[in-house]
Swiss-Prot record:
This is Pyrokinin-3. It comes from the Eukaryota. One of its GO terms (biological process) is neuropeptide signaling pathway. Mediates visceral muscle contractile activity (myotropic activity). The modification Leucine amide is found at L8. Keywords: Amidation, Neuropeptide, Secreted. Corpora cardiaca. Its main location: secreted.
Amino acid sequence: LVPFRPRL
């Protein structure tokens, strides 16, 4: 899990 959500 990452603290951010990359915009793909």
